[in-house]
């Protein structure tokens, strides 16, 4: 499953949170994420104190466990998402989307 994760960091937690993240090595980041999450892309709006990523994992529980590592520092939203191929498969078989 693919998940879109967004985060926003409150002003009072911004500098400590970004300092902690900025000090992490690639290995630290992988350890923080765990072995069962594949990071497909992550982007940061540093001035806006927010960002997002797309990850792949077997379950929401796996992604939620990673999110708990940062839950005290930022507001996190996790949404299951589909790529174009999967979305088209759902839409093509849905009765509301069938051509008449």
Q: What residue ranges belong to the model's regions?
A:
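Conserved, structured core segments of small domains
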Residues: 1-100
